[in-house]
Amino acid sequence: DCNGNAILDICDIAAGTSLDDNGNGTPDECECFATEYCTASANSSGLPAQIHATGSLDIGTGTFGLLADDCPPGAMGLFYYGTSSVYMPFYNGFRCVGGNIFRLFPASPIGGNGVATHQADFNTTPMGSGAGAVYPGSTWYFQFWFRDHPAGGWEVNLSNGLEVTFCP
């Protein structure tokens, strides 16, 4: 009974009260996934920055993290997340995260290899409590914002987006 409704999952699926679109026997609302979405613009590295999930999507393991690659080496950036997805021009790129926005401090330095990382902490604000609390079964949208002085223009760009549904 992954969704805690006191009905066996197989019975939920058979009764049609839970969907199982992929036919794996687990109700869709109980599955976790990370899907990249939204288009990023090329930055001064010549490539668009890409965001990825690292570790496990199971909150209980405490290993979930974020990684952005193809970023301008030596710059600084900030991972952030929100309650919905959008697609709108923003600085030198596109904003992919909307709704209520939560920043993940501290800022992340981009290494010489063009990679920035952030290890999630589900025990502190904003991920651990309040409006930005991440809990099993919740879906959030992540993106990486970074300085890009050599690119000119607004001197700021963003990665693509990452939609994550965390495991119960």
Language-model-detected regions and their locations in the chain:
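Residue-level hotspots within well-ordered secondary structure
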Residues: 32-168
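Extracellular calcium-associated, cysteine-rich motifs in secreted modular proteins
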Residues: 1-33
